Amino acid sequence: MVTIKDVALKAGVSPSTVSRVIKGNQRISEATISKVKKVMEELNYFPNTAARTLITNQTYKIGLVLKGSEEPIRLNPFYINVLLGISETCNQHGYGTQTTVSNNMNDLMDEVYKMIKQRMVDAFILLYSKENDPIKQMLIDESMPFIVIGKPTSDIDHQFTHIDNDNILASENLTRHVIEQGVDELIFITEKGNFEVSKDRIQGFETIASQNKINYQIIETSNEREVIFNYMQNLHTRLKDPNIKQAIISLDAMLHLAILSVLYELNIEIPKDVMTATFNDSYLTEIASPPQTCIDIKPRMLGQQAGAAILNILKNKAQDVIELVIIDRELKIRKSTQR
């Protein structure tokens, strides 16, 4: 069996240097890191994580907590890119990730509690932000390091790191662009749930619609196509009225995909009958017919920053490494808002 000493000998460095490379120590030169990793590949050497856990009392794993149904999350490009960004950063520093997903809060709490008590992870990243979140309170009570992807929702939240976009400003930018194309009425379609991202995007939408004296309505629905179909069917006559210029803005790309499917079935043409726009750019919005105007909120960058932030907390062995990191966004204008 190849040992760390074998790697060190062939690479011409000390075993402690090899160990630091495995742990992702940034004080080692890129040349040394590259050389050690090359030798590890040549010798087919893999670190014994179980032994390392016993010695260091660390698991070198980060727990990722997602609130929602497993299938929609697995198919959602936003979460895929956030998770990719987190994994990239963690892997560079010798950490892995362990994900737990559930739409049931009690099940999610049980799983997180088990991960804490069985010492399965060293810290957590919550991939959502919600008021009065019992999981967040559990992590505080158990003195577990964690950060949140999303905005602070209370005074106590400002004691912890949050990675977010300015969703109010992003929604204002998108709504303003749509209005500038000429509209009489606006519809904002959102999912049910008390999540901060939804509140902020609705707030930005309402602010700009009100400032421009545009009639608007907000529809709360589920991601289920049948429910969306019923809403759109009730609006069909109005959406087809050539004397009323209308636009639909949706909360995110997955909900938007269901809306586009329903509009197609109802023979409502985009952008002729109604303009459409959304948030969370991906291949779903880029290759849609027609391609959809959207706000790119840089999910991979969100994940990378989240990974860096939680590792920084672990490195300094203190939760009080507090940051509020705002990731930039970009408006991508496509045919769905070009009449």
Residue spans for each PLM region:
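Flexible loop/turn connectors
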Residues: 232, 236-339
